[in-house]
């Protein structure tokens, strides 16, 4: 796959910098992800039981002439939900490069494996950013365990985006997530 291209700013009226990349419903088998999404939809009063796919998200933003920074969240270790493969998400986003600006996500707990993946994604795809969700990923942003991954991101010229503050994720569910 060639390096990622970015939307032409003259073709959009705004950029949404916080858009989640979700897989189609049913791909997670019995790991609880679809039930989790259904409960999230109830909490946030969404008319949909599952968030839109990357393709549906692109179509929505394209119709509104808005670009979107889109990313998965690798919270596999903490939640037990299979993560959305970064490479697969990048390939779908590349097909919609007129409106999607893809970031990727790597759980800092992956250690050296995560560092290697970050370097590969930057070198092969030209990834510009990485999304972290400390609550969902079960770490503190200042945990030294994450520093090698941050260094790889910085050395590759990419940025890190952190979810901060309160989160609705897990609200109203057993254990609150």
Model-derived regions, located:
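Helix-coil boundary/capping segments in enzymes
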Residues: 1-177
